[in-house]
Swiss-Prot record:
Belongs to the connexin family. Alpha-type (group II) subfamily. The chain crosses the membrane at residues 21-40, 77-99, 149-165, 208-230. One of its GO terms (biological process) is cell-cell signaling. Residues 41-76, 166-207 are extracellular. The lineage of its organism: Eukaryota, Metazoa, Chordata, Craniata, Vertebrata. It is a multi-pass membrane protein. The gene is GJA4. This is Gap junction alpha-4 protein. Residues 292-333 are annotated as: Disordered. One gap junction consists of a cluster of closely packed pairs of transmembrane channels, the connexons, through which materials of low MW diffuse from one cell to a neighboring cell. Disulfide bonds: none annotated.
Length: 333
């Protein structure tokens, strides 16, 4: 096997900008795929062609039967699977690096604009444009990029591509080899003169390895699907929170009708502490309220001394009498 160190370093950088499910997927890829294949792959499949024997001495028959039995070696097929499945993740890493470099350039440009002594309209407009561009790049407090906006689209697309590629390679493995390694392969292909029986070395061990890689592939596929569900739920929750923030009701005291559910009281007025308080306005009709106002005015008039004394009557004239209470009451009714 070749050196996987470079690919591991690249995928390790992706782990810093992935979700929890994405980190688990990378762990499965590192430990149960690349590491196991690198350690045990050569020892299990190293004798794949050398120990493939057929019961014929016809020159070239063994080679053509091996080609028919294994169109591509299992171990090379799995290496191609790892490379293709990792490619969408590397594309996402490229987008992360691009946004990180862009955010650094925007911060540098913002610092240069703020350092200018004179603030003319052009500088203000340029600074506002830089701030708008920086607002599109969401950076956490620890310096990691948040998966939002365009980065979210790239991440979802990468997970979708990984799922499709994973399912495609699993289907291809089933079509090419099946899920078991048969100990005897029957071949009929030119230049073989007749049906030839070919024998595979250590078929049981290879069957166990095939099943192990199949289970790991299914786990990776399930993790990709779970990550899609996780991303969908995250997007829906953010949308619901944003909608609730827009549709939030106004705070108490800011109602459009300032007199809603308010009761107005009249202060009690009387000659002594035992005087009954005046009833509320909301509890009386208009006629009853007028009568109550009239009674209050009469009490006030009787308790205050007159401000001006009337002149004595002359020539036998009678002093003008007060208007009758009935006439006064009529004007309030």
């Amino acid at each position: 096997m070749g050196d996987w160190g470079f690919l591991e370093k690249l995928l390790d950088q992706v782990q810093e900008h992935s979700t929890v499910v994405g980190k688990i997927w990378l762990t499965v890829l590192f430990i149960f795929r690349i590491l196991i294949l690198g350690l045990a792959g050569e020892s299990v499949w190293g004798d794949e062609q050398s120990d493939f024997e057929c019961n014929t001495a016809q020159p070239g028959c063994t080679n053509v039967c091996y080609d028919q039995a294994f169109p591509i070696s299992h171990i090379r097929y799995w290496v191609l699977q790892f490379l293709f499945v990792s490619t969408p993740t590397l594309v996402y890493l490229g987008h992360v690096i691009y946004l990180s470099r862009r955010e650094e350039r925007l911060r540098q440009k913002e610092g240069e604009l703020r350092a200018l002594p004179a603030k003319d309209p052009q500088v203000e407009r340029a600074l506002a444009a830089v701030e708008r561009q920086m607002a599109k790049i969401s950076v956490a407090e620890d310096g990691r990029l948040r998966i939002r906006g365009a980065l979210m689209g790239t991440y979802v697309a990468s997970v979708l591509c990984k799922s499709v590629l994973e399912a495609g390679f699993l289907y291809g493995q089933w079509r090419l080899y099946g899920w078991t390694m048969e100990p005897v392969f029957v071949c009929q292909r030119a230049p073989c003169p007749y049906l030839v029986d070919c024998f595979v070395s250590r078929p049981t061990e290879k069957t166990i390895f095939i099943i192990f890689m199949l289970v790991v592939g299914l786990i990776s596929l399930v993790l990709n699907l779970l990550e899609l569900v996780h991303l969908l739920c995250r997007c829906l929750s953010r949308g619901m929170r944003a909608r609730q923030g827009q549709d939030a009701p106004p705070t108490q005291g800011t109602s459009s009708d300032p007199y809603t559910d308010q009761v107005f009281f009249y202060l009690p007025v009387g000659q002594g502490p035992s005087s009954p308080p005046c009833p509320t306005y909301n509890g009386l009709s208009s006629s009853e309220q007028n009568w109550a106002n009239l009674t209050t005015e009469e009490r006030l008039a009787s308790s205050r001394p007159p401000l001006f004394l009337d002149p004595p009557p002359q020539n036998g004239q009678k002093p003008p009498s007060r208007p009758s209470s009935s006439a006064s009451k009529k004007q309030y009714v």
